[in-house]
């Protein structure tokens, strides 16, 4: 049996936006919740100076705190696959289905856990790299060695590489998502 639990970690959204999100979630059959982020839970864990030797901005502190909270929720509540998605991504209606089926197929073919990135970033085509192409359910997928903070992975990968994931939330790297590339 497949279970979905949609969790939105929110920081300072307008009430009208939260109401609209809740309205859309209520139309679904998914278990869902909206959690208000408390920055004080994470502020002391974030280094105040970043990789460029500049002060970390309040906006970046909220972003890092949000990611940290999302990782903790996944670690404590997820049983199988977890999809981390930033708030500025649009999806085709069948996107999540495709990702789950592609994950199953590719993980079975390679006999290993994956990090699946649903977005094909144009900047990744600026260098010539050999890659592998995999067939998903209806789309093709290619191997890359970097991503941003929108990806699907297993709880096993999250637990195995917990320190790398959390390091994004404690120190502002350059690029920010550098720990995901290592």
Region annotations inferred by a language model:
Residues 1, 17, 59-67, 91-95, ...:
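Phosphate/oxyanion-binding active-site loops and adjacent basic polyanion-contact surfaces
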Residues 2-3, 29-31, 78, 108-114:
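Short helix-terminating capping/connector loops at secondary-structure junctions
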Residues 4-8:
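Hydrophobic targeting segments
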Residues 10-12, 88:
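Residue-level signal for short, function-critical loop segments
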Residues 12-79:
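Active-site-proximal specificity loops/subdomain of glycosyltransferases
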Residues 81, 90-165:
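Conserved catalytic core of nucleotide-sugar-dependent glycosyltransferases
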Residues 157-161, 169-182:
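A short, conserved alpha-helix in the catalytic core of glycosyltransferases
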């Amino acid at each position: 049996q497949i279970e979905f639990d949609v969790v939105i970690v929110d920081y300072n959204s307008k009430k009208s936006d939260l109401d609209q999100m809740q309205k859309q979630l209520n139309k679904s059959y998914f278990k869902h919740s909206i959690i208000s982020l408390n920055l004080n839970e994470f502020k002391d864990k974030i280094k105040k100076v970043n990789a460029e030797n500049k002060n970390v901005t309040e906006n970046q502190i909220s972003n890092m705190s949000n990611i940290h909270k999302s990782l903790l929720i996944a670690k404590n509540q997820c049983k199988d696959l977890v999809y981390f998605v930033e708030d500025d991504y649009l999806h085709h209606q069948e996107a999540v289905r495709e990702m789950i089926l592609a994950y199953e197929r590719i993980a079975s073919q390679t006999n290993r856990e994956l990090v699946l990135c649903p977005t094909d970033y144009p900047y990744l085509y600026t260098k010539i790299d050999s890659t592998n192409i995999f067939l998903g359910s209806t789309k093709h997928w290619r191997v890359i060695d970097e991503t941003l903070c929108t990806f699907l992975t297993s709880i096993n990968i999250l637990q195995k590489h917990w320190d790398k994931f959390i390091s994004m939330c404690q120190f502002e790297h350059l690029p920010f998502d550098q720990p995901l590339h290592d």
